[in-house]
């Protein structure tokens, strides 16, 4: 029986789903397009190429998870910007500035979130 110390590298990854989403987001934040392969991301994370399919049926499912994480982050940034304001009007303006700032900091993710892929995707989560 193999112990954890004897297991091959990448044999078990406790948070593989989150690690793959994070690797995909880092890929986009590095200025790259979403044209990566799941194999490329699994290599970065240190697991076998087939391990990703335990969490994502396809690359499209991973892209959906990445877009959802982008929307979650954008929502948190806008909410934080709104809460820091004294009036509704100032909060509305702050939310708009947070939206633009997010798009400027994460242009590839923003394109994924608001581009054709999400618009044409039938995912219930993205509606």
Where do the language-model regions lie?
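N-terminal intrinsically disordered/low-complexity leader segments
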Residues: 1-15, 26, 85
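Short glycine-rich beta-strand segments
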Residues: 48, 104-105
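Alpha-helical structural elements of signaling/regulatory helical domains
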Residues: 33, 58, 83-87, 105
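Alpha-helical structural segments
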Residues: 15, 19-26, 44, 61-83, ...
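Short glycine/proline- and charge-enriched loop/turn segments
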Residues: 3-5, 116-120
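Short, structured loop/turn "capping" segments at alpha-beta junctions
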Residues: 106-111
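Amphipathic alpha-helical packing segments from all-alpha helical-bundle domains
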Residues: 121-127
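Helix-turn-helix
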Residues: 19, 23, 30-61, 65
């Amino acid at each position: 029986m193999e112990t954890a110390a004897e297991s091959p590298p990448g044999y078990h990854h406790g948070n593989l789903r989150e690690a793959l989403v994070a690797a995909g987001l880092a890929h986009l934040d590095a200025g790259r397009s979403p044209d990566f392969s799941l194999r490329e991301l699994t290599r970065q994370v240190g697991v076998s190429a087939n391990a990703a399919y335990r969490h994502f049926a396809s690359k499209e499912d991973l892209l959906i998870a990445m877009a959802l994480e982008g929307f979650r982050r954008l929502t948190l940034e806008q909410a934080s910007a709104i809460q820091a304001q004294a009036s509704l009007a100032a909060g509305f303006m702050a939310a708009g500035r947070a939206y633009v700032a997010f798009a400027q900091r994460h242009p590839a993710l923003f394109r994924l979130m608001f581009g054709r892929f999400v618009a044409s995707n039938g995912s219930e989560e993205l509606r």
